[in-house]
Amino acid sequence: LKECVAIDSDAHRLVRVEENLARLNHHATLICAEAQEVEGWHNGELFDRILLDAPCSATGVIRRHPDIRWLRQASDIAPLVAIQAQLLQQMWQILKPGGKLLYATCSIFPEENAQQIQAFIEQHPEAEIIALPPELHSVSTATNAIGLQILPGNGNMDGFYYALLHKPSQS
C-alpha cells in the first residue's frame, strides 16, 4: 500500500481513526471534508482502490441499538439513496482504470444496497461486479449477483452490505 487517504465529514471520527492507526502502527492522510465535494479535497490523482462506506440508515445495527426502529422514518431513505448515488458516481470518476471500489453500508434495505448497485451498473455498463471471497458467504443471508447482505445477528454481527466493483482498464 503506497498511500491511504481517509475522508470523513466528522472531525471526531477522524480522531478515532487516527488513534486506531497509531495503535496499529499505520499511517494515513486524514481529510475532514464532505466526500461528495470532490473538488474541495481531491488533488487530481486517481485512486487504485476505494472503500466507500456510504452514509446510510444504519438499520443493520438494530440489534445493538434497538431505538433505531423509532428514530428512522420511511422518508429518511430517499435522501440517503440520493447521497449514496452521488458518492458512487463521484468515487467512480476518481477511480483509476483497473481499480476496485468496495461499496459498503450498515443497512438492511435493498434500496440502499443491491438496488443502489444495480442502478449504478445500469448507468455504467462497463462496471464489473467482482464476487466476494467464499469465506464471507458463511455469514451472509443473501448472496446474489449484486453483492452480499449480512442480516443483524448472523455470525453474531451487525447487518452489512458489500459490493465490489471493478473499473476495467481502457483498451
Language-model segments: which ranges?
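S-adenosylmethionine
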Residues: 1-171
